[in-house]
Amino acid sequence: MKDMSLVNSKVLLVGSARGIGFSVLEHLLQAGAQVMAADCEWQLLLEQSESLLGRYPDQLTLKKLDLAEPEAVREQVNQWAEQVAGFDHLVCCAGILHVAPLHEMPMEQVSSIFTVNAFGVLACMQGVASSMKARQQGSMVIIGSNAANTPRMSIGAYGASKAALHMLVKCIGMELAPYGIRCNLVSPGSTRTAMQQQLWTEQYGEAQVIAGDAAQFRLGIPLNKIAEPADIAQAVLFLLSDNAGHITLHDLRVDGGATLDH
């Protein structure tokens, strides 16, 4: 088996200031990648990345990017790709969540979720695609969700946006496969992040997520634990690496068996 070294690979990482994205950033730098890390939370990105900039001054560049404006995102990402003579890899971890019953959620919130989670991520993929096509190589790994395949109460818009994203990734992956470009998804289940904690209350937290809840029509987690951000990051690095050289259009679910692989 080949190692998962990404030495000198140029990676655009979108959504890198917290949670899964920040763990992916740490793993990419440890693997030797040259990373352009972008996030809409600029101040948080600066604060979180301070120690990484000290340890990897020649590998890390920080940028601000807001996926709420997809047309601007596509143009900006394309410009960055031109500046670095093309990215080898794109990783998108960005996403937003509003928690409310879908039958009551304001359309403004539904629209904002789709704009960021589906259209903004698509804009990133479009932004790197032309330079990858010209070089006849590249890979994209997009963070999806196991909620794309399994209905969940109070996060219906989020799940629907991720379902749309999954199909966008697979379709663009099919279009780009003849050019040697691989496009894959990593779909986390419950993971120890701030977004996950938005769903927890005093009565419903980590233990209940693991055990499952019939009233919420939720199975538990067969592995009896929630994921850590590093679990997701390691899956991302595998799909970026040469070990996954014949894998594309794939959804790698990292949820401890919570959706029984359906």
UniProtKB/Swiss-Prot annotation:
Job of this protein: Involved in an early step of the biosynthesis of the catechol siderophore vibriobactin. Vibriobactin is a chelating compound involved in transporting iron from the bacterial environment into the cell cytoplasm.
Active site: 158 (proton acceptor)
Keywords: NAD, Oxidoreductase
Reactions the enzyme catalyzes: (2S,3S)-2,3-dihydroxy-2,3-dihydrobenzoate + NAD(+) = 2,3-dihydroxybenzoate + NADH + H(+)
Pathway per the UniProt entry: Siderophore biosynthesis; vibriobactin biosynthesis
Family: Belongs to the short-chain dehydrogenases/reductases (SDR) family.
GO terms under biological process: siderophore biosynthetic process; vibriobactin biosynthetic process
Keyword NAD: yes
Signal peptide interval: none
Molecular function terms from GO: 2,3-dihydro-2,3-dihydroxybenzoate dehydrogenase activity; oxidoreductase activity, acting on the CH-OH group of donors, NAD or NADP as acceptor
Top EC group: oxidoreductase
Protein name: Vibriobactin-specific 2,3-dihydro-2,3-dihydroxybenzoate dehydrogenase
Residues annotated for NAD(+) binding in this entry: 12-36
CDD domains: DH-DHB-DH_SDR_c
UniProt gene name: vibA
Binding site for substrate: 145
Top-level taxon: Bacteria
Keyword check for NAD: yes
EC number: 1.3.1.28
